Amino acid sequence: MQNQRIRIRLKGFDHRLIDQSTAEIVETAKRTGAQVRGPIPLPTRKERFTILTSPHVNKDARDQYELRTHKRLVDIVEPTEKTVDALMRLDLAAGVDVQISLG
């Protein structure tokens, strides 16, 4: 796998789970002899929702909620066959969305 690069993007609502998952990925890649760049924190997306608490009147009474989506990026440069095999067997947390691209 010469001149290859694996780019892994992680998304989730809990930043502790994402940091734990990136640490597992980096440790696995370094253990198999690959060079790792990252984890790089990407901008956090904040979605805010405003909801009227009263069903009829009192427009001033509102609740506000926020949903934060945290993202991390990990690049694995020049991965070996062992690296790809170890990453495929890696079991990550359920609250983390993982996107893998080869480049």
From Swiss-Prot:
Ribonucleoprotein as UniProt keyword: yes
CC terms in the record's Gene Ontology section: ribonucleoprotein complex; ribosome
Organism domain of life: Bacteria
Example of a GO MF term: tRNA binding
GO biological-process terms attached to the record: translation
Keyword match ATP-binding: no
Keywords, alphabetical: Ribonucleoprotein, Ribosomal protein
Pfam families registered for this protein in UniProt: Ribosomal_S10 (PF00338)
Record PANTHER family: 30S RIBOSOMAL PROTEIN S10 FAMILY MEMBER
Subunit annotation: Part of the 30S ribosomal subunit.
General function of this protein: Involved in the binding of tRNA to the ribosomes.
Family statement: Belongs to the universal ribosomal protein uS10 family.
Name by which UniProt lists this protein: Small ribosomal subunit protein uS10
Organism: Shewanella halifaxensis (strain HAW-EB4)
